[in-house]
């Protein structure tokens, strides 16, 4: 407990930053515009980043912000036309977007400055592909010893927007910046009501993607801070650097530092939940918590999480958002995998002097399986095969050149193998590869008005085989099982590529 309070005091001593004056600097908005153009994530919305940057309009915006009545009228009249320019909708939209993008950069500055206080020995290599959603690999590779139950947690929605501002007060004591944050939240949503659905919550993401990431990241960091604090005390972590791979779906940066709670509330419950075998991971607005103990202890955890949300966020989390499942019978959809936890027997031969004996040890570990039915259904909707998995031609692509057809089929196959490289059983992937290969051949044969056999004899199956198995070198982590006969490409080999930033479209067509 003393260590936790010491960390809290250190965080509080680094929070005196005043960044509000930067909003009156022209270079800030140019930087925000360039950041949007260089963003490596797919463009999901139409924002000011898709418009031509105008330094003249930025100067006009800064001049208007210097006016005393600018912010007063904005608060009293939160309509978009009255906010910035009621005569010209383009000016109004441009001002709103560029100002919110600039403000997003401003509020991130205190967090960036605080990273300079981190000890050098704890620095993590800055690989460009550490943003991968497969940063959950450390959880999937954990050995679950003496664990019987999993807690599936849905991170609570809705939240009141004022809670977001209050959470940032721990890190940003620049009062004008906090007031401006309230202004943006008031402008982008209905301030006097709760956000009652995920669709409404992501309205803020549609308006300003970067600001949404920052606010959501801060909120979730506070939500899981106490869990990560307990997890760091564990002596059973599989990787020393696993703390650096905290899962962040579609976030531009990973954050190691978390907000501070009331130590008095923590002291009363910390003793009951000190567990050196805690396993925690978050993905797609959900989280999984696994630790040793009985069903009674898991129910205690469930009600503790409910009370924690009510105490820390002034928000009542419905108990039905936390599901308790027995580990042996747990099978769930996990980032495009069907994950289960089978008990694998392991025979170990021990020998003492002249006597030898066998020890039967059962290891508990996540088994990641490719969902064959789901993927075949997705290929069927995309008109690559029938509902039963029989390959068919794709007539809409027959107007393309032969190279474009091969390239499209090849990219789909590569993406499937690349994304599901962490699967422990890859036979389903080879079945999907067969479907795509034959569908490609049927499409080319239909284009040239010949049979598949004739076309394959003329083109050669070797070229197709090499084309579909070509793989670009990327940074990856491999966790292989100990076998007497090992070769690359084994069905039991699990490779976690660290350049995957979103879910494959065939796995989750909605994302």
Swiss-Prot record:
InterPro entries: Domain_X, Maturase_MatK, Maturase_MatK_N
Lineage: superkingdom: Eukaryota
Pfam entry (one): Intron_maturas2
Subcellular location: Plastid, Chloroplast
GO cellular component, one term: chloroplast
Keywords, ordered alphabetically: Chloroplast, mRNA processing, Plastid, RNA-binding, tRNA processing
Molecular function in Gene Ontology: RNA binding
GO biological process: mRNA processing; RNA splicing; tRNA processing
Name this protein carries in UniProt: Maturase K
């Amino acid at each position: 407990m003393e260590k936790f309070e010491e960390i809290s005091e250190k965080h509080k001593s680094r929070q005196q930053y005043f960044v509000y004056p930067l909003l009156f600097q022209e270079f800030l908005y140019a930087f925000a515009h360039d950041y949007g153009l260089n963003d490596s994530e797919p463009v999901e919305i139409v924002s000011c980043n898709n418009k031509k940057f105008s330094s003249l309009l930025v100067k006009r915006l800064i001049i208007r912000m210097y006016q005393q009545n600018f912010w007063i009228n904005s608060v009293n009249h939160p309509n978009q036309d009255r906010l910035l320019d009621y005569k010209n909708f383009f000016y109004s939209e441009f001002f709103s977007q560029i100002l919110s993008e600039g403000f997003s950069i401003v509020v991130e500055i205190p967090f960036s400055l605080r990273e300079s206080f981190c000890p050098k020995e704890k620095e993590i290599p800055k690989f460009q592909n550490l943003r991968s959603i497969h940063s959950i690999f450390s959880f999937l590779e954990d050995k679950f010893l003496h664990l019987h139950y999993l807690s599936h947690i849905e991170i609570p929605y809705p939240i009141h927007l004022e809670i977001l501002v209050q959470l940032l007060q721990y890190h940003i004591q620049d009062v004008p910046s906090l007031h401006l944050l309230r202004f943006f939240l008031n402008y982008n949503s209905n301030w006097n009501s709760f956000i009652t659905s995920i669709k409404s919550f992501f309205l803020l993401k549609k308006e300003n993607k970067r600001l949404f990431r920052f606010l959501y990241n801060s909120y979730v960091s506070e939500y899981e801070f106490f869990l990560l604090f307990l997890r760091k005390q564990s002596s059973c972590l599989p990787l020393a650097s696993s703390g650096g791979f905290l899962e962040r779906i579609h976030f531009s940066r990973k954050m190691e530092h978390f907000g501070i709670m009331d130590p008095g509330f923590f002291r009363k419950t910390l003793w009951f939940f000190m567990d050196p075998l805690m396993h925690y991971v978050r993905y797609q607005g959900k989280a999984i918590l696994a630790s040793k103990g009985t069903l009674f202890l898991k129910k205690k955890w469930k009600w503790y999480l409910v009370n924690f949300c009510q105490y820390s966020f002034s928000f009542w989390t419905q108990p039905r958002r936390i599901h308790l499942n027995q580990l042996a019978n747990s099978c769930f959809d996990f980032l495009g995998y069907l994950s289960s936890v089978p008990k694998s027997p392991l025979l170990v031969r021990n020998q003492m002097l002249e006597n030898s004996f066998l020890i039967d040890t059962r290891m508990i570990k996540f088994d990641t399986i490719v969902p064959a039915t789901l993927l075949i259904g997705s290929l069927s909707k995309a008109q690559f095969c029938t509902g039963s998995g029989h390959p068919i031609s794709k007539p809409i692509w027959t107007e393309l050149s032969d190279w474009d057809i091969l390239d499209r089929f090849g990219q789909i196959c590569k993406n499937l193998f690349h994304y599901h490289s962490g699967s422990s059983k890859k036979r389903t992937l080879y079945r999907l590869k067969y479907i795509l290969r034959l569908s490609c051949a049927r499409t080319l044969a239909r284009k040239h008005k010949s049979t598949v056999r004739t076309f394959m004899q003329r083109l050669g199956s070797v070229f197709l085989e090499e084309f579909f198995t070509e793989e670009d070198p990327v940074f990856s982590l491999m966790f292989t099982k100990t076998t007497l006969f090992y070769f690359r490409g084994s069905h039991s080999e699990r490779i976690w590529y660290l350049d995957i930033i979103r879910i494959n479209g065939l796995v989750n067509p909605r994302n």
